[in-house]
Amino acid sequence: MHGAAVTPPSTVSPTPVPTQSAPLSVALVSHRCPDPCEVTGFHSRRVHEPCEIRPSDDVVLFYGPRMGQELRRFSTEANGGLPPFAVLATCLDWDDVCLALDSGAIGYLLEIEDPDLLAAALHCISHGHTILAPQIAEHARVTSCPGGALRQTAAVARPDTSGSATGRTGDSSPSLALSPQEREIMTRLASGLSVREIAVEMRLAEKTVRNYLSHIYGKLGVRSRSQALLRWLGHPGGETAHH
């Protein structure tokens, strides 16, 4: 197996996750890899197109290397009609992490040795909780200073040595910089909702939500949804998403 064991990091909501009497139904998207042994305890089946997703599915799991592009295709073609979806990667690829998060994934895990850990993570994801592999969450904490690069190896953003325009330091919680409305939008964004879905739930125009996000990105010193999510979720002061 690749990567360290995935333990639920600080991105999991403290709200207890209800126990399910029936096993999770997992729609598995994987083109070349064999089924991961970790999902054998669930009702899982292979799917190749978004139209194959069933209303009874609890989670869509994209398994294998560089599945971000396929995840984006599913998300776009389903037009918001997917259950919570996540990636189980065979190796850590920062470009793929950001592509998956930008496309609405609420989980990005690495292959693990203990099936019980993945089972717990998938149950949390099925209830809308965001789960990141510890390596991803820790990297976000270390490089989460305003204006700094969230993933230096992929050069998503160049470090800003001049500091933030707001005068905040890397030790400040990202939530402190945001208004209550902006925090609510980030909470919903972290749960995997699209701009359209956030607008509907908050009874706002889509343009208004996009304007809010533009201001949020500026305050957090980031340039994209994935960077904002890593900053928001990876920082110890970040807030978790729950429905």
UniProtKB/Swiss-Prot annotation:
Keyword tRNA processing: no
Domain HTH luxR-type: 171-236
Name listed for the protein in its UniProt record: Probable HTH-type transcriptional regulator GfsR
Biased composition (Polar residues): 161-178
Top-level taxon of origin: Bacteria
Pathway the protein contributes to: Antibiotic biosynthesis
Function, as annotated: Probable DNA-binding protein that contributes to the control of expression of the biosynthesis operon of the 16-membered macrolide antibiotics FD-891 and FD-892. Might be a member of a two-component regulatory system; the putative sensor kinase gene is unknown.
CDD domains xref list: LuxR_C_like
Gene Ontology terms: biological process: antibiotic biosynthetic process; regulation of DNA-templated transcription
Organism whose genome encodes this protein: Streptomyces halstedii
GO function terms (MF aspect): DNA binding
InterPro entries to which the protein is assigned, alphabetical: Sig_transdc_resp-reg_C-effctor, Tscrpt_reg_LuxR_C
Pfam families: GerE
Region entry Disordered, spans: 154-179
SMART domains on file: HTH_LUXR
Annotation: DNA-binding region: 195-214
Keyword annotations from UniProtKB, A to Z: Antibiotic biosynthesis, DNA-binding, Transcription, Transcription regulation
Extra remark: The macrolide antibiotics FD-891 and FD-892 induce morphological changes of human promyelocytic leukemia (HL-60) cells and have cytocidal activity against tumor cell lines in vitro. FD-891 produced by Streptomyces sp. MAFF 225003 and MAFF 225006 inhibits growth of rice and alfalfa seedlings and may cause russet scab in potatoes.
